Amino acid sequence: MNSRMPPFAEAATADLDGLTVAYRRAGQGEPILLLHGIPTSSRLWDFVGPDLAGDFDVIAPDLVGYGRSDKPLDRDVSVSAQADLMPALMDALRIDRATVVGHDIGGAVAQILTVRRPERVARLGLVDSVCFDSWPIPQMTALKRAAPLVGKLPPGWIFTALGSVLERDLPERARESLQASLAVWDRSPDTLAAFLRNVEALDSSHTEAISADLGKIDVPAHVVWGAADPFQRPEWAPRLRDAIPGATLRLVDSGHFVPWERPDELVAEIRALAARS
């Protein structure tokens, strides 16, 4: 499962609240914080980071429980907990404010961070983001229910199955980054347990709790959505746009993984967002 595609930057780590959080950082300029979803990692941004790093300070962390970050079984790994950890990461990297872009559950982290700590967010970008009660998707709900049984199966089974499902519509180079994201789950019982804990933490109550507060966001916001997204249906996109004052929306010819499927278009959208004030 090793990828031939190198990451856009080598991983470094920060110690935050007793946790080791891995991140990739490249470039100089105004900070852009890129947040991945499930079951990916900072490798989601392999084809977005290099271009943006030509003009920006690009930071892509592995959320707790993902990638090369710690995978604790005794800590809260919900999207709210992830959002609460982001200011500490920004402090460690000496970043006051950033343009924050989140994909999938990373979009929930970005929404919650913007609502709770608006002084840390200069602009908000949401890419095929979970929102309101759009999640967990049925496949993840089924996996949550089956977690006790899945936990007894050979560890490699779930990651092989995930890879085969998710890579169907991805270009070859994106498949390599997907496999690199999945490869960190080293197919041992401990990492399988950590992955299932991430799945069990998927809970729409976190985004539902801040839905009314989206109307208080007063930074430039932009929503990008794959018009053929099978996991977060495109119907959610205009609802999310309309909930955030002044937000704009762009539908692209893509499935769920726009950063892998249409990286050039996404880079253009992020650059346009970063130019707004």
Say what each PLM segment does.
Residues 188-242, 253:
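Conserved serine/cysteine hydrolase catalytic core
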Residues 158-173, 180-186, 197-204:
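Helix-loop "lid/cap" segments that line or gate small-molecule binding pockets
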Residues 115, 122-153:
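Flexible "cap/lid" loop of the alpha/beta hydrolase fold
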Residues 102, 106, 110:
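Gly/Ala-rich beta-loop-alpha elbow adjacent to hydrolase catalytic centers
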Residues 16, 59-102, 268:
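Active-site loop/oxyanion-hole signature of alpha/beta-hydrolase fold enzymes
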Residues 19-68:
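Conserved HGGG/HGGXW glycine-rich cap/lid loop of the alpha/beta-hydrolase fold
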Residues 1-32, 53-56, 95-97, 245, ...:
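Alpha/beta-hydrolase fold catalytic core
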Residues 247-277:
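Catalytic active-site module of serine/aspartate enzymes centered on a nucleophile-bearing elbow/loop
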